[in-house]
Amino acid sequence: MQKNTKTYYAELRRKLKEKGFDTSRTQTYDGMLRVWDGIRMLGDIGPQGEFYCNSNDLADPHRKEQIETIMQCIEEVNRS
């Protein structure tokens, strides 16, 4: 990744907020960016754009759609 982590996470936060997600930096896992839907934690984004989530969420159509939206945001920021 060419961008530094702080700039990368700032861009991700902005993009995710546009899509209705909340974010926070985690105190563990090396300060990853945690993504929430306002109520439930959906996963963590690492500094290289990797997304960690519960694989069981992929079986729920609503959660799967949310995860796909998060992945699209990551991809858009990585391309910019």
Where do the protein language model's features map onto the residues?
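Ser/Thr-rich, low-complexity intrinsically disordered terminal regions
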Residues: R25-R40
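Residue-level detector of alpha-helical secondary structure
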Residues: R13-K17, E68-N78
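Intrinsically disordered, low-complexity regulatory segments enriched in Ser/Thr/Pro
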Residues: R40-Q66
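Negatively charged, low-complexity tracts enriched in Asp/Glu with abundant Ser/Thr
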Residues: M1-Y29, P61-K64
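Short intrinsically disordered terminal tails
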Residues: M1-K3, E75-S80
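Generic detector of low-complexity/intrinsically disordered segments
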Residues: R14, E18, V35, D44-P47, ...
